[in-house]
């Protein structure tokens, strides 16, 4: 029976993905309009194929939009498949008294397995016996711990122990880095810890992004408004159904139904879906150039609206490369400590050593104490450094702590001046092991006494000039307890280790621990040759007997350092009103220290109620948890379930949550968050569950992405304002002509041309608007803030009403005021359907012949020119054209030129004149078009002035977050 394999769901069929693209209100409205237009075209008299232009164009747009949507679709299926990579392929199992290799998926609870260094754990297992002095597992992929974890067979009595504290359990998907052991399988398949992550990913229902939700709400509102207006227009004309001009009640009803459909086509921003997709796609290109690869288009905007970033610590805020920061030994007088600062935070074997700002060179030559420390670090070490010539980066093969010590040895150099001169001329890539090799050749290795959990140390036996020395490294509290002597000063005279010396060193260890540094003590035993246990030691107790009466040489303090640019990034997030919450599996002291260094906490800030461990958080009631997440900025010793819970709580408070991470353990929370941000060097599971991947693993890139996201949202509002005000203008135009009883000024094919081509090009160009100057000093938008707020709606209506009125007035002008026109009265124009009965002398054919087409051309040209001017207005929501001129966005300049060129094409190319039922304009008509269109700029400048005065509040009155005042921008 296949117990271990994780269940796989079948892939989503293509037809389902395509169908999903049509579950959008705007798309459904367009689909309905296309259907009605097609039916009306079938009943059109004559063989005029232009009747089918409307439905064909609409359907073409819908198909193109669906293709783009399916192409961009990213599902959890790939993430689930990637989880299989973290499942071991085979396992060594004891069955029927025989040891055999079987497929890991065939394991069942109760199987006894053997596992050793380099193996991937095939199932969740309970340790039975350890066949080596120590047994360590790298479980960062599951828990996020920056160091490998020592395991043992002792029982854990705490039933609520988190995974990090379950030291007798091996978790499926983690890797053994040291030792050999026997274990019994307890959980397989979906029941394992990694199986739980699989279950979390598959069970989650993807929530719509804030932008998608707002567009859906906007679509719902638009659907209702369009339906009401269309029905209203049809009903107010019921009395005209029997007018002689229509030739019967039924034909009159169909005629006004066509007008109602025209109204529907006019009201729907056909180009909106394509323009939004294009805008987001352009945003992804910009962000990719800045090392942020977006896997889901709507997430571009979503990141711009996030109010909380939940960040994993290890590998995200930190380098995930242990590095030594401090080198310490007692000074010559023994009343203080000599502290040497070490430069560099990666595994690159280069960096200066300094004391009080003064650079120190050839330390191993000038200081016997430092030389002895280098000897211990070089010999008590099984890690190796590696260099990738392609990326130019350095890495560690083995324990990260030992890798950090190896790097320090190379930074210190050898105890030979001539060797050092040659050594430091070499590039870092060629001196990965040069200094270490020097000490290894001087001190041949005789024996290794492996690390054990009980004595918290390891040692090596070396020889020099026929003398034998024991070099030891380990936890300071354990080493200090077993030391009898200590070296004083740089030249290292050995003196007894008194209580005063011991207390001085112990205080430094505590101080370093509070700062998040991991401290390693270095010691030696010089007169070891006479110890009878030297060649017979077999147990850790005997190893401990060897490691007695030691001489303490010094201490080293190391940490997984924060990335240098993270502090500035956190500062920018605060200025943007974004909370940064750190969620890590690491211990509290280390996490709090890192948080203080990067600015999440102040240097001396009281962390009461702001820092919780996973266990402390679990002990809270639901209401207390909700209160905790309002203030807390750090959660340490957490498990994957904590991350998902925190995302739920934050979202329930109305926050838009971004979650960063790089491990398998992060995947469920990455998927649940409004936007998941994975690291480029992270696991495939994390990357495939995320919406965005940071190729440079740089938390600071998120700040760039936030700014781009905010800019995209602002631009989205601008081109929606631009498109909708145009649509409102068209609706007002059709409604006014119908209400006034005038002939239709614009026909559906003209409206489609304006909506798709003439408007579409500038709308797309608005995506290139540069961000407003204060875009990163505004408070984040609230989750429930509508895309179209009250003020924005008023602006839509104000501009739209003018657009519609100007379009209708252009039609009226041609018939009533144009010196080259018929100059009939307005009453005659508004009663054209009674022309044959009441005033046939004017020539009723003018309402359907070339005169009508000329008037319609004036209306269409006014609409187009106003929209070009309106596009200029949309450069900024509140900044005047005088302060934010047109050439700030040259793409818009080109778009306006192209749109006008296309308009001239339909005006002056005969075939297109026929298609759009228009005629060329003369100079008199063009002057009228420009005069009627120009006031829209002045109107919008007044509205911008009002927004600056009334809706942009002074910063002191703005929202405050993390002690920073913000200037809110209102829609």
Swiss-Prot record:
Sites where the protein binds Ca(2+) 2: 727, 730, 758-759, 867
CDD domains: P-type_ATPase_SERCA (cd02083)
GO cellular component terms, A-Z: endoplasmic reticulum membrane; membrane
Keywords from the named record: ATP-binding, Calcium, Calcium transport, Endoplasmic reticulum, Hydrolase, Ion transport, Magnesium, Membrane, Metal-binding, Nucleotide-binding, Translocase, Transmembrane, Transmembrane helix, Transport, Unfolded protein response, Virulence
Pfam families, sorted: Cation_ATPase (PF13246), Cation_ATPase_C (PF00689), Cation_ATPase_N (PF00690), E1-E2_ATPase (PF00122), Hydrolase (PF00702)
GO aspect biological process, one term: calcium ion transmembrane transport
Name of the protein: Endoplasmic reticulum calcium ATPase srcA
Species the sequence originates in: Aspergillus fumigatus (strain ATCC MYA-4609 / CBS 101355 / FGSC A1100 / Af293) (Neosartorya fumigata)
